[in-house]
Amino acid sequence: MQLKAEYINFKYKKDKYILKDINLSVNSDEIVGILAPSGFGKTTLAKILAGYIKPEKGKVLLEGQNKIKKLFNPVQLIFQHPEKSVNPKWKMKKILNEAYEPSDQMIEAMGIKKEWLNRWPSELSGGELQRFCVLRALSPHTKFLIADEMTTMLDAITQAQIWKVVIKYCKENNIGLIVISHDKSLLDKVCHRIVNLEENHKEEIIENII
């Protein structure tokens, strides 16, 4: 399966274009990095790929077809700030089971403690909350996963644990993974190739990955 963006252009109202003629393709067996500093439209591109917003020009195709949102989006997006991605009026068990019920093995692998399931989002730390958001996105229906600065705000141990689970799951389930970050050292470690938005979409092939 392939997720493809063709000639994506986007600007906010009368501002200048933050995305101009972006072309990107990701296969279901790939890990592709998107590298750029703040202000280059990384998150906007992520939202377009996931169907949250529409480009001013261009299109996003899933297996050659215009991507249509169904009951569950096959392209899942994980944001940098997990507190903005959950319903504060729901307890964590309901949030986690919104799309599917993950196995006890997956819950344990993600480092989620059972007592957290009965807590409110406000009672968890950012790292604890992000574990739930990541696991929620790893549904059997997910075909492509977009990680937008997914672990930037987390400590090194939590980062390593989350990436280990995500990469293993994506490989085992043939899920395409798009890693969006300003941190090239992270992309060098986890990606097959990197697209640099700052350098005219220059592509770099990475030989050594986790």
Predicted regions mapped to residue ranges:
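Conserved ABC ATPase signature
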Residues: 120-124, 128
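Conserved structural motif at the start of ABC-family nucleotide-binding domains
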Residues: 3, 18-19
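The feature captures the beta-strand-to-loop junction immediately N-terminal to the Walker
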Residues: 35-37
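Helix-to-loop junction immediately C-terminal to a conserved catalytic motif
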Residues: 50
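Q-loop/switch helix immediately C-terminal to the Walker
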Residues: 81, 88-102
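Hydrophobic anchor residue at the start of the ABC signature
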Residues: 134, 146
